[in-house]
Amino acid sequence: MCKYAKMSLFVLLIVGATFFAYYNHVAFGPHFSLSKTNFKRLPYWEYDDQSQALLAFQKSCVDILKREPSAAFSTLPQSKSNQAWQTICLAANKLSHSDKMTAQQFFESWFEPYTVQDNFNPHGLFTGYYLPLLHASLKKSKQYTVPVYGLPADLVKVNLSLFGSDFSNKIIIGQLKNNTLVPYPDRTAINSGTLGKNANVLVWADNAVDVFFAQIQGSVTVQLPDHQSLLLGYASTNGRAYTAIGKVLIQNKVIAKENISMQTIRAWLQGHPEQVNDILNQNASYVFFTVLHTQDPLGMEQVPLTAQRSLAVDTHYIPLGVPVWLKTKIPEQRPVERLLPYHRLLIAQDTGGAIKGIIRGDIYWGAGEDAAFAAGHMKQIGRYWLLLPK
């Protein structure tokens, strides 16, 4: 989704984010270590139905098959060349309607697992994100007054890596004024109408809080009054620094840190409508959207995400397209609120502003109330193993 997730919901509400371009340039160094293991040592490997993971991997293959065959897949020594992955993808694409056993045999035949460690520590933080629902209209009215903007015509992105290796993975965003690149307007200015005709309004929403949370997620399903729907995806940010409103509310001592979640923040904002604009404007960062013509939101590979099979990672360490065996715990709301063990094969398909670190992941939960609950409450320690070509 290229969310703030992307873009961890929990962490973004409390900490913040920075945006980077996607490259499979992995910072393989003294703190990042990989050690080969075997599938028998992956906890509960044999119990997962990996047919859904195979479908997600086939989506990543759409991107992988477009890459230059002779180039390295990433700077990870064990990841081999694009050609090696393309051979695997061609084999994967021959498998249609695969069952659990066939999918498991596929991954075991083509890959071998590697334990990931950060300075000899295999554990890290795992969170979640989801696809929210936004009630909106194509026309402005008394009910629908909050604009959801498309990409402004005057927004300029500069890829600094084109100017030298010192600026690798750095992008700045602004606008030209008198032949000088200056920062793009912040959230306060945008909400005051400064964009004018530079940005099209894609839809008009009925709730500023819902628009704000849609920006955090990076994609949103729009429910129109005639019951038709649109899928909006991330187009760009305004380039301004991100300030987490959860952190603001904690500092203002209106919500205790241990109680912070998407749900508690939303409830507080709904209970204090007179303070909504002031709180939201504390975050200068603003997200612009584009209309997607796909059934599911797109990840950084520009392929559709799969609920509970797509993982946002830090591409400084984990290349996109890599299968990842994850062990952690997840929140469940029904029948009672509790934590459940979670062992599942996912595919690294997305990135996020809050997803930073060697062992760090953000599970895409899909849409609906249960997905919203999981994404809003998930903040668990876990570990993962990379599946790399034999």
Give each language-model segment a name:
Residues 25-35:
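Ser/Thr/Pro/Gly-rich low-complexity linker/stalk segments immediately outside membranes or between
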Residues 8-22:
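Hydrophobic membrane-insertion alpha-helices, especially the h-region
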Residues 20-21, 47, 62, 66-67, ...:
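Targeting-peptide/extracellular-domain and disordered-appendage signature
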Residues 35, 46-49, 293-390:
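C-terminal soluble interaction/assembly domains
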Residues 1-6:
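Positively charged n-region of N-terminal signal peptides that target proteins for export
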Residues 33-292, 301-303:
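Secretory/export targeting leaders with adjacent low-complexity proregions
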Residues 14-17, 149, 333:
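Compositionally biased, intrinsically disordered low-complexity segments
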